[in-house]
Amino acid sequence: DDVWLPEKVEKSIKTLKEKNVDFVFGDLEVVDQNLNTIYSSFGDFMLLNRKIKRCINSYKLNYLYNCVTGCTILGKSSFIKDILPIPSKSKYVVHDYWMGLIMSLKGKIAYIPEKYIKYRQHGNNQIGTNKISHGFKKLDQVRELFINVKLGVFGTYVENNDKFPKELQEQNKKALEY
């Protein structure tokens, strides 16, 4: 139920070709059910845009911050074999998080700062900005959640170790043995 602006696909394809990358994603506008703006820029609201501009192709960026929003993604079909299957057992790794990480490990990524999607925020979103931003009341809750999520994400990566380059497989093995 998100709204794609008419130029979304065309601009994504153009960026993919012009920047000679394997995968593009972009910012979006967060709106309510009546398309009224809640946040004009998801990237600004979540404090991601500055990080993205600094280190777009680092897997560490996608691992720590989950910068990729699924509905903004466009990638080359040759990468489907790398991202599939998407881990389904993990409660911590959702599809866009997984795709962003794998693409940053295996290919080149470009970011489109323009907003070609109106992301409709409601109770049925898989994650949603309200659940992310307004659910934390105390710093301890945030710290505890961060630790638990990263441990869960790491566990998912270990289970899918064959998707990663050899040097990262070795790092995963060392971390697991630690």
Question: For each predicted feature, which ranges?
Answer:
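Terminal low-complexity segments of carbohydrate-biosynthetic enzymes
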Residues: 136-178
